[in-house]
């Protein structure tokens, strides 16, 4: 039962990206899995909250100047709890996810040679019958508007924490890279957000899938490879935690 729907579009105030589409190429090696990233306590706490939550956001669809839908709110109705909602419900959830962000930032920055800032957290439920067609996170990828920004052009990198696996279907797939897999509970995943990395989710056929999606805005590229068309300069450089836990990275491999 849905007890409440909170109207909110919790978008970041950022309006662009310094990282052009295609900057990270199209290799499958840019799609990374970190197994057992969450502790058992973190995973259990977040899953218990998500699976018992009955309060979800209400958002508004948006179109660009050509009339193309760049955000379809109907797809996410009664399925998403973003920062504003989570803060009203349980601040410990927000604090726990931010702690995960802090740990993961070290690995993301190191892997892509960037200084990146995480967007606000959200929890998404995927009940039976839901699915997601292939899409890019920061831009449109089909039709006459392909390559134009969607409603989130600052989503340079995608991040995902998975909370459970007691469902059928719900596999994450990348058509361009030829891979499809069921994400592991407690794991973290990240990959570029442009149209070289379009991805989708197969239909949930039983159970409910719970995910924490978020994104990274790249504030700075930290090695010799620099984008040609920088748009923004940033002052809020984040400090790395020298005491972070070492995580072994494992790129997702193509299925033979």
Predicted feature descriptions by range:
Residues 155, 166-256:
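Catalytic core of Fe(II)/2-oxoglutarate
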Residues 2-111, 233, 255-256:
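Non-heme Fe(II)/2-oxoglutarate
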Residues 58-62, 135, 224-227:
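Short, solvent-exposed loop/turn and secondary-structure capping segments
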Residues 38, 50, 138, 163, ...:
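Short beta-strand segments enriched in hydrophobic/aromatic residues
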Residues 123-126, 142-168, 218:
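Short, conserved beta-strand element in jelly-roll/cupin
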Residues 52, 128-129, 162-165, 194-195:
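Glycine-rich, acidic and aromatic/proline-enriched surface loops and short helix-turn segments
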Residues 51, 95-147:
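Non-heme Fe(II) oxygenase catalytic core, chiefly the N-lobe of the double-stranded beta-helix
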